[in-house]
């Protein structure tokens, strides 16, 4: 990094800053620079970010140039790709006026996502000192893709603002926004804000995203509709719904009651939410590497009432044909369709079952007290007898394959920072499975390697040892016992071909003890 700042009566303030070779795990910027030069009536500045072409990113050059004067400022941003094609060129001029600040978009033919747009020549956004906003702005291309932001004079309202987005293709922005997530879809949206003469704010929103995709997985067409309406009594009411493929999947309605000095000492809330066949498949796009695949949907209702800081929750959740598939183990977990009830903020599992291919389930019994989200109290018991944890043939994706049968008994009690876990697992004798140790640091090859080693005997006593911070696992007190029956065949392949491997045989007792004070 280079920083140079100079001041003098003759030349004023001059500054420059350069940062080279900024790198993180997923970010690589070759040059970041900023320069400022003072002139008699204004300060000129130019800045930018330069990234060269790399295997994980395309080259780009982003610049932000402009000037700042006593009563006026302007800035222009430009984006060039590796071929020096202009993806963005748009600016804004801000001017101080009596009673507020006026903003204008320049030029009248800006470039966005490599296309020319047209801005109305009389465009403005006026921010008044009294908080009111007046606007008349429209930016559209030949296909009527773009946005508009305008105010409507209304004698019955202090402010009446509308923001409209038309045919905005989200995926196109990946071409001009480095490191943007892999998301696609077409947005059509309209937001309306009204402030009445008595200062009440009203907001309505209609939003549609068609052909939504994330990480290459199609999520369908989505729509959001919401209304915010305050009342004279102080109540703030909201009503909304979310639809997927023209079917309602989430609805919400509720009110927030701010505290009053006499009758009410604390803020209150009264809200209801309902899930209508909410599809779990949408979670698959957010799971890295398709490590797990969800299917099925959720139905249920939830009501929150009482103090806003610690509301009481009541309702139930129904899992409808919910399955979780883990490709690396060819494991399919099927969840019980029995409703899970929530009463007075206590989530109760009444012998809730999880099945695999086998006949005997994994059972969860107990409850989770969610009255205080920061200190949720858990009291759970988990049991399984002759549970078929694994029954799969080897595939290209397999990390583990074969057959694995277990008896499992465990209890989990306490809060997240004071958790007590006790239990045992017995691997039954009819188990025969193989685990593939990928990217293993262990090797049995090259036995003659390092027969001769060259050592640098230079003095290293002055070198300070790097102290790594201790990794605390919180307030967990765990004692788990593992028993491997006679007859269990457990093989660990050191590579994918299985040319090097280890066998594990009968073991009377292996204990894993983790105390609260343990740090690594």
Which residues fall in each region the model found?
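Interface amphipathic segments
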Residues: 1-192, 196-301, 309-409, 415-520
